[in-house]
Amino acid sequence: MEKKELYDGFLTLEKHAQQMLREIAAMKDDMAETLERNAELEIENKHLRQHLAELEKDDNKTSDGGVELSKSKQNLESLYNEGFHVCPMFYGQRRVNDEPCAFCTEIIYGEN
């Protein structure tokens, strides 16, 4: 009878461990969504602050000779720098170890 109780104890422990793994996976997914939403909101906040600053100024900034990105490409660049893909194939997914993506850089810095 002792072996049966030991076996039943292991089965119960296994069920609890599996449930805990499911909960951890759900928490991980929630955390990823929260981080992505946070990055989006930070970029939106930055964009709104820039827009407000432009409205408050009477004159426009002039380019200093370098290539100036449009607002939409600046937003894509910000997302990319935050660690997210902006290319059509992987849009919104996190870049693994912030590795560069040729597709993303082509979208941001390539010619129209």
Curated annotation (Swiss-Prot):
Keywords: Cytoplasm, DNA replication, DNA replication inhibitor, Metal-binding, Zinc
Subcellular location: Cytoplasm, Nucleoid
Pfam families to which the protein is assigned, alphabetical: YabA (PF06156)
Annotated binding of Zn(2+), by residue: 85, 87, 101, 104
GO biological process, one term: DNA replication
Cofactor(s) demanded: Zn(2+)
GO cellular component: nucleoid
Annotated cofactor note: Binds 1 zinc ion per subunit.
UniProt family annotation: Belongs to the YabA family.
Subunit structure, interactors included: Homotetramer. Interacts with both DnaA and DnaN, acting as a bridge between these two proteins.
UniProt cross-references to HAMAP family, sorted A to Z: YabA
Function text: Involved in control of chromosome replication initiation. Inhibits the cooperative binding of DnaA to the oriC region, thus negatively regulating initiation of chromosome replication. Inhibits the ability of DnaA-ATP to form a helix on DNA; does not disassemble preformed DnaA-DNA helices. Decreases the residence time of DnaA on the chromosome at its binding sites (oriC, replication forks and promoter-binding sites). Tethers DnaA to the replication machinery via the DNA polymerase beta sliding clamp subunit (dnaN).
Name listed for the protein in its UniProt record: Replication initiation control protein YabA
Organism: Lacticaseibacillus paracasei (strain ATCC 334 / BCRC 17002 / CCUG 31169 / CIP 107868 / KCTC 3260 / NRRL B-441)
